[in-house]
Amino acid sequence: MGGERRRLSNWPMLHLKQSLKYGLCALLAFANGLAARAQYQTLLSHDLATLQVLRNGDWRQRLPLISLTGGDEIQISFDDFSAAYRRFTYDVVHCEADWTPSTQLFATDYAEGFAEGLTIDDVQPSRQTQVAYTHYAFALPNDQCRLTKSGNYEVRIYDERHELMARACFMVTEATMKARLTCTTNTDVDVNATHQQIAWAVDYQGVNVTQPDREIKTVVLQNGRWDDARINVRPQMQTPNGLAWQHCRALIFDAGNVYRKFECLAVDHPTMGIAEITWDGRCYHARLHTDEPRPNYVYDESAQGLFCVRNSDNRDNAILSDYVMVHFSLQTPLTSRPIYLNGHFTGDRFSPTCQLHYNETAGLYEAHLLLKQGYYSYQYLTPGSDGRMVPVASEGNFYQTKNFYHALVYYRGVGERTDRLVAVAMP
């Protein structure tokens, strides 16, 4: 492998006419547009991989979210395939509810110390791996940068030439308001079938909100996916003390199915979900069992899109875990619409590297990604008629699926200069 990341092919979709390609691009615009605006977790260089943004290093946390007054921290890490040490720096940028930078704030308005040009100094080379890399990590807040305002934050990571290499996003909340959320399978479109519906409410907790349409912004997320976020849905009820959403069709989600999963802990024998592991003289290849159609719901524990880096010894996972070329295959009827792998390890983006391509000889959709050893949960999505990404039909869509929902409440009072994150709700 020689320390270089193997790039994936961008094959043309079989039997897809040029005009249809343009149409599919339009269908994807909504999903990718919101993801791009959210600027969630994004790698901008093929030299970098495995960007993680975790609260207290806990991969089970659904959202990278900390309290303004708590003692938690956001831990950010990534790997660099160039292997040799590079001086990476980062800036911390406060953002509005829509993830655009807060142009009315100076850095001193949201951070004590420094918010620009900070050096990443926790650097470790990989050990005993076939694919060489250097691991970089840092945490916020730290001795140089202490955050003083709630809201959305984007960390911009630069190389020594000050070229933007990655964006890492997280949220800081304050307990100014209170929100509550419930999920039901008795929806306005079906009952105990293929959908789940969210009902929720916001209590102002004494905050004087005079123009809620202007002062309050809301986001509802399923499994932490910003590409499918429901933004500023109009509430059915407004009172002097709060807002409520009941029987709101915009808050109906596809139930989907339990995310598929695999675990690559060792390179000398297959582990969960892996059919075989081979060596090509440069790197290891892990071929997963073919993902077959799921006509029925079968309960299984899954992290619903999360992933965790680890190896069989569960020791020094960050620098002892190797990179493996993972081969995915999906048995599903040929379709004119593209099919994508989706999970937090893809950044919830639908890029060419995450697209599956049809292998006529095998009669399967296939994709391969270079991934760090560990546990991964994933699903297969395709553009729906409205442009939103929906589960591939053969994956199944069942009301029993255990999905994770969050509602975020942002507030900007009259005369204030930015959006604050004042409440977070989950079932």
Regions found by a protein language model. Name each.
Residues 1-40:
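Bacterial Sec-dependent N-terminal signal peptides
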Residues 99, 145, 159-165, 267-272, ...:
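Short acidic/polar inter-strand loop motif in beta-rich domains
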Residues 51-96, 191-202, 316-328:
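Contiguous beta-strand segments within globular domains
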Residues 42-43, 172-195, 398-422:
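Low-complexity, Pro/Ser/Thr- and charge-rich linker/hinge segments at domain boundaries
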Residues 39-68, 176-189, 302-315:
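Short, compositionally biased P/S/T/A/G/V-rich stretches that sit at domain boundaries
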Residues 111-136, 226-233, 327-373, 385-414:
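Aromatic-rich carbohydrate-binding modules that target alpha-glucans
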Residues 286-335, 427:
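Basic K/R-rich, polyanion-interacting modules in nucleoproteins and related proteins
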Residues 132-143, 150, 157:
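Ligand-binding face of N-terminal immunoglobulin V-set domains in extracellular IgSF glycoproteins
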